[in-house]
């Protein structure tokens, strides 16, 4: 049986909605939703929380996550990337935990509708198909890249982004293959 580690990240300093990860939705802090869902999963063995903010760490602990470290500030800036947060957590776990994990699932607090069924379905797909990684995606319901244009800054004219001419564009959107976009609610690897 594969051992699964859940990692829930939340940093301070949000510019769009200050303090968003601590904001209450139905009297529950946003950061608690993935912790609650992971706690109900059939497959997750341990939940760790990564943050640079002690108050968020305390909240995460109160909802059942372990908080073995405070995330270094260099991994909690506007320019920080998920990979650095993940590698920091994995390196810490590898160096400091006796138990070993086979799979990591990364759960974003900004997707509070992700529930234990979504998590278990993703992990079951991952196990069944022997995936190396898995990411959540969604079909674009409205904007197809075939209709994207770019602006020529010199002539101030638009031209198709993917095609040579506008006449090459399909008139019927139903004739286009569906396109999907990453919705990083969860990552598994």
Predicted regions and their residues:
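Catalytic metal- and UDP-sugar-binding loop of GT-A-like glycosyltransferases, i.e.
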Residues: 107
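A short, N-terminal amphipathic alpha-helix
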Residues: 30-46, 58
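Conserved core of the sugar-phosphate nucleotidyltransferase
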Residues: 88, 112-189
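Short phosphate-binding loop-to-helix
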Residues: 54-104, 113-114, 121
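Short internal beta-strands
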Residues: 32, 47-51, 136
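N-terminal nucleotide-binding beta1-loop-alpha1 segment
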Residues: 1-18
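Short, high-confidence coil segments that cap the C-terminus of an alpha-helix
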Residues: 44, 99-101, 130-131
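Residues in the short beta-alpha loop(s) of Rossmann-like NAD(P)-binding domains
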Residues: 28, 52-54
